[in-house]
């Protein structure tokens, strides 16, 4: 890739899998890496970016934009990912574009009736349907996944088929995040770093999981 064309950095730390990728402005993935974060996102993310630069022969001075997954996901991972994306964008004077990790994962499934299942603490799960707010449900809903559903980070708490589809979605996450991010960038729709916040996989205030009857609407919490 010509350095004059610039390149796009893609980061996602919403799940236990850290995703780092580089792409071209026309949507081709140059290189990517995905690995288990082991709850060490703050120690693992920047070294992964450095490895990406070295493998692909890229330079930060040629960076054109940063695309970052915004969740829903775990508190620590998301904060590290967004802080890194914002810092790089600010220091290099390039736009930052937030993309819902859930939307990118569901996009890999081609839309349709697929639902995404994510952990929300030790006893509850979030279920996400494209275009709708996530719902918080009890873990006793395990086994209700359909043939189209995806499950992430729910080993032992979701069907093996849904977990396998989730692993496949994670494999395709770099391409999906890049595609969705570039669509926003092409429309001139970028984020103000001061207003870009993650979506945490926690119950909404005032509606603890123990009081949820089958599922409660969940909203972004900018804490």
Residue ranges and their predicted role:
Residues 67-96, 101:
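DPxDG-like acidic metal-binding loop motif
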